A protein has these predicted regions:
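Short internal beta-strands
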Residues: 36-41, 205-209, 320-322, 339-348
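Nucleotide phosphate-binding/pyrophosphate-handling subdomain across enzymes
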Residues: 3-11, 23-27, 31, 127, ...
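Short, basic phosphate-binding NTP loop
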Residues: 1-103, 275, 281-285, 366-382, ...
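Phosphate-binding loop of NTP-binding sites
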Residues: 10, 26-29, 56-61, 68-205, ...
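Short beta-strands and strand-loop turn motifs
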Residues: 39, 152, 171-173, 390-395
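C-terminal helical cap/extension that packs against the catalytic core
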Residues: 329-387
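Residue-level signal for inorganic ion chemistry
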Residues: 28, 64, 104, 133, ...
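Residue-level detector of alpha-helix initiation sites
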Residues: 19, 108-112, 250, 301
Length: 424
């Protein structure tokens, strides 16, 4: 651990002034750490403390705190300074003590699992804070003694982290994602596995069973715990929560249940706590039911692996698909195409998605959500199917038409409510 007085003897470059970078600057100013400079390609973002000669600063500083949004450090000529690069989460672990940390990562389910664990802790009278990639930047949190800090860590953050040492490190899953950022699956996997690298023998590693062999080969020191879905399923029926009844949350819940047992939270308390949990928006969000139609917003599904969960857990689906596809993503429909009545392709990459689904399922080109919904609702009016599902689960990023998945999901909900009144 480093004290604030130790930090004052070191020099820093804050590279990238997005939300994370601005949080680091705020942390330095609050603690009267003056020996720092900043750099961002957008010269309008920050004028004071700005590096005048970037190469000179890179060579002189002790640490470079890199924004998680900066992908290719080679293009930025930063790779030769890799030993100096750290992240805001490193700074958090280096400067805080007397707290318990739960760091969650994985391709799918990070945010939901963080919220589940945070909710569980609050309901069982633990002091808890939630931050990192979800909500509050980690350095903005006010740490008090014995507080549990639940941190969502993305692969971008972990890729350059060196000092993360969680009491409970959770790796939910790894599938093809962010390969445009990491280059290949092995780099992506290695960034996720860094969550365990600095753990001690008295700390816990909760890991997906499919990754157990890889974990053991790396000779990590922490106590390995592999959650079992079949154990969670024995109590699942007792949880009175419609959102958690779906199989889509089985993995998130099995990790949360395993974590609860490590803290010796009783089964009864776990069941009671989970019954009051409210799910996050844009994650298999059932937001409207009208007559024989269920509307589900799963805008957070930015890869097919994510969308597959929603398709597997829905019936008679009118599926809205499309956006900016992830690198090397493939659509495999075996085992789930029976759930799909028809697919509606939207966005600016129609040819890509068309090539993935043609000759597999019935589909229509709709270009945007509005046109898709009008087509779907007209077809439902002519259908004799008793219960229909309109599912936005795009299997792609939103950036072709929206600034983020939240805006995409909000637009879908707004349009759905409007056209449901007109057609149903």
């Amino acid at each position: 651990m480093l004290s604030i007085s130790n930090l004052k003897e070191l020099s820093f470059l804050v590279y990238g002034l997005g939300i994370t970078g601005q949080s680091v600057v705020k942390f330095f100013k609050k603690n009267k750490i003056k020996n720092f400079t900043v750099w961002d390609d957008n010269k309008k973002l920050f004028q004071s403390n700005r590096a005048k000669n970037l190469n000179e600063v890179l060579n002189k500083v002790d640490f470079i705190i890199l924004s998680p949004g900066i992908s290719d450090i080679k293009k930025k000529n930063l790779n030769k300074f890799n030993s100096k690069i750290i992240t805001d989460i490193d700074l958090f672990f280096l400067t805080n003590k007397n707290f318990k940390s739960v760091v969650v990562t994985g391709t799918n389910g990070k945010s939901t699992t963080c919220k589940l664990i945070s909710h569980l802790l609050k309901k069982n009278k633990f002091k808890v804070l939630l931050g990192g990639n979800i909500g509050t930047p980690i350095l903005d949190l006010k740490i008090t003694k014995d507080v549990y800090v639940v941190i969502e860590a993305s692969s971008f953050q972990l890729s350059h982290s060196k000092y993360i040492q969680p009491d409970y490190a959770i790796l939910l899953n790894i599938t093809n994602d962010h390969l445009d950022w990491h280059g290949n699956l092995m780099n992506y996997m290695n960034s996720k596995l860094k969550i365990f690298k600095s753990q001690k023998k008295n700390q816990f590693a909760l890991i997906n069973g499919k990754l157990e062999k890889i974990f053991k080969k790396r000779n990590f020191f922490s106590k390995l715990v592999v959650p079992k879905e079949k154990i969670y399923k024995k109590i699942k029926y007792k949880i009175k929560n419609h959102y958690l009844k779906s199989n889509i949350n089985n993995e998130n819940m099995s990790f949360t249940y395993t974590f609860s047992k490590l803290l010796k939270i009783s089964k009864k308390s776990f069941i009671s706590s989970m019954s009051s949990f409210v799910g996050l928006p844009h994650r298999y969000e059932i937001f409207l039911k009208k007559k024989n139609v269920i509307f589900i917003n799963d805008s957070k599904a930015t890869s097919f692996e994510s969308a597959k969960y929603a398709l597997s857990n829905s019936k008679n689906v009118y599926w809205i698909l499309g956006g900016k596809p992830k690198k090397n993503d493939k659509i495999f429909l075996s085992g789930i195409k029976k759930n799909i009545i028809k697919c509606y392709v939207v966005g600016k990459n129609i040819k890509f998605f068309q090539s993935q689904i043609q000759n597999k399922i019935s589909y229509s080109i709709a270009k945007n959500q509005k046109k898709a919904l009008i087509k779907i609702l007209n077809e439902i009016k002519l259908s004799d199917v008793k219960e229909n599902t309109i599912l936005l689960s795009p299997a792609a990023a939103s950036y072709d038409q929206f600034i983020n998945f939240e805006k995409r999901g909000d637009e879908f909900k707004k349009l759905s409510k409007f056209y449901a009144r007109k057609f149903i």
